[in-house]
């Protein structure tokens, strides 16, 4: 694995990767970072498809069963444990950074963001917001604009608000997600 490892996770309900997530993946690939991804349907498979189509090979599919449920030809590692949350916890401990593609409701993805003790970029699946979460800073949950001002489409929100909770867990709980 490269020195920098990215834990990519997301909601199972998501059917396509938002443009902002694709841009983040392109930057990750350009820097040659190792990507850890799970073996579930939804975002895990979408991520694998995108990386496979790009010919990117610095990918490890993590799983708890004897074989991954979904693997599009990448290296894989069986993680000790019997629950999918064991796999998520392993990836959270192993990664330096995280990328989450979140539907805004999935408690599993929210918990994955909270597990990471480092920076996480969370892209909202409706492609309207991008959230920078940094559990080690004083600002634990910051909304940053998804795009630069888009005069041709005033419906694209540019949102700068933050919860000064100091911890991602508290910020997620403000949104009704228990970690």
Language-model-derived ranges and their functions:
Residues 98, 137-140, 166, 171:
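Small side chains
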Residues 2-3, 14-127:
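Acidic/glycine-enriched connector segments
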Residues 1-3, 177-179:
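Short, Lys/Arg-enriched, disordered terminal segments
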Residues 155-177:
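Short metal-binding segments enriched for Cys and/or His
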Residues 74-76, 141-146, 171-172, 176:
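Short glycine-aromatic motifs
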Residues 6, 59, 156-157:
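A broad, low-specificity signal marking well-ordered, structured residues that form hydrophobic/aromatic
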Residues 4-12, 131:
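Short, hydrophobic/glycine-enriched beta-strand segments
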Residues 128-152:
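Short recognition patches in nucleic-acid-associated and regulatory proteins
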């Amino acid at each position: 694995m490269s020195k920098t490892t990215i834990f990519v996770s997301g909601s199972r309900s998501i059917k396509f990767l938002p443009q902002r997530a694709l841009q983040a993946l392109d930057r990750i690939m350009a820097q040659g970072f190792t990507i850890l991804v799970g073996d579930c349907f939804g975002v895990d498979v979408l991520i694998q498809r995108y990386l496979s189509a790009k010919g990117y090979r610095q990918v490890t599919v993590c799983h708890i069963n004897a074989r991954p449920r979904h693997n599009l030809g990448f290296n894989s590692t069986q993680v000790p444990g019997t629950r999918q949350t064991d796999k998520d916890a392993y990836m959270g401990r192993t990664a330096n950074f995280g990328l989450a593609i979140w539907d805004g409701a999935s408690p599993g993805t929210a918990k994955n963001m909270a597990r990471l003790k480092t920076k996480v970029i969370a892209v909202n699946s409706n492609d309207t917001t991008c959230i920078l979460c940094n559990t080690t800073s004083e600002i634990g949950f910051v909304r940053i604009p998804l795009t630069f001002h888009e005069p041709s489409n005033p419906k694209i929100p540019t949102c700068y608000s933050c919860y000064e909770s100091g911890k991602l867990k508290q910020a997620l709980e403000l949104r009704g997600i228990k970690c």
